[in-house]
């Protein structure tokens, strides 16, 4: 998605709406043991005037029949924690990051 980097707030909003409109399809196709994790490689404020990344946090939304609701993970030390958590879900272990899958499921 290039809208945030291009500071195109209208395009950014429309792209998010389009993505959101497809979520019911994904949810309908999910099996009982599937977990959907939606995240980003960094946070970004598309209204910021500069061209660099801003200091917003990277989002993480988790959905699945086994997912616990209302979990506050606090501020993590590294974005690698998300990668480690996804790897844990598949029974893998990465060399960086502290997984938190046990807090989500």
Regions found by a protein language model. Give the residues of each.
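Feature captures the catalytic ectodomains and active-site-proximal regions of enzymes
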Residues: 1-105
């Amino acid at each position: 998605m290039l809208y945030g980097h291009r500071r195109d707030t209208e395009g950014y909003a429309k792209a998010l709406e389009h993505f959101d409109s497809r979520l019911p399809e994904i949810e309908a196709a999910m099996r009982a043991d599937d977990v959907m994790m939606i995240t980003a490689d960094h946070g970004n404020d598309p209204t910021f005037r500069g061209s660099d990344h801003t200091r917003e946090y990277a989002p993480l939304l988790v959905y699945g029949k086994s997912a616990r609701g209302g979990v506050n993970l606090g501020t993590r030390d590294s974005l690698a924690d998300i990668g480690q958590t996804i790897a844990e879900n598949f029974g893998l272990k990465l060399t960086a990051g502290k997984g938190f899958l046990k807090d989500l499921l």
